Amino acid sequence: LMDGKIRLNAAAFWQEWDDFQFSRLDTSISPITLTYNVGNAESNGFEFDFTAMLAANWSLSGAASFVDSNLTSDYARNGVDVDAASGTALPRVPETKWNLSTRYGFGDDFFLQAAYMYTGDSYNTLFDGGTISTQRRTQKAYTVVNTAVGMERENWSAQVYVNNLTDERGSVWINAVTWDQRVTINQPRSVGVSFTRSF
């Protein structure tokens, strides 16, 4: 597009599962994770990515995905009482994810870059297990900002970076087992230097 200044890719998808499987750790049954057949499910969505050259030394890129995934049949562990009804959202699948990044070069070799990444809400498990530690909980949306400044030559590059600039603490996963519930968070703010050389 625009004489090669913009590149755009997009895709839509629709997927149906028969005998969808779900992994869950329940220490009242087994000390290891078990896989359950939970019926039928579907996942529909749309995703795209783009890169745009705003100037000879300035680029902008991004990507996004929008997913609707849920059960299409009721699930009952004991065959009678429904634990997850048809229409229940599948776990660990954010409905929305997107990112935006930019890179600006100046002088002959120097560059600045920044990236903004958003992960939407998701659920930690398929159904509520009946105890505090096995509750179905929402893993809240969070954002991460990464920045860097560096130098790039023909066969090497070096940069100083700050990942997770705002020190955002997002819940990557909240477990749902029969002992204490624990939350795994994303990596906190980190500052570093990297060097790359091509041979």
Language-model segments: residues:
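Extracytoplasmic loops and strand-loop junctions of Gram-negative outer membrane beta-barrel proteins
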Residues: 28-35, 80-86, 128-135, 141, ...
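Gram-negative outer-membrane beta-barrel transporters
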Residues: 7-9, 13-16, 34-128, 194-198
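Short coil turns and loop connectors of transmembrane beta-barrels in diderm outer membranes
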Residues: 2-4, 18, 54-57, 68, ...
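Short sequence motifs at beta-strands and strand-loop junctions characteristic
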Residues: 2, 38-42, 90-97, 138-143, ...
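C-terminal beta-signal and adjacent terminal beta-strands/loops
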Residues: 118-128, 150-199
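Short, glycine/charged-rich beta-strand-loop motifs at protein surfaces that mediate ligand recognition
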Residues: 11, 132-139, 145-148, 156, ...
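Transmembrane beta-barrel architecture of outer membranes
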Residues: 33, 95-99, 142-146, 180, ...
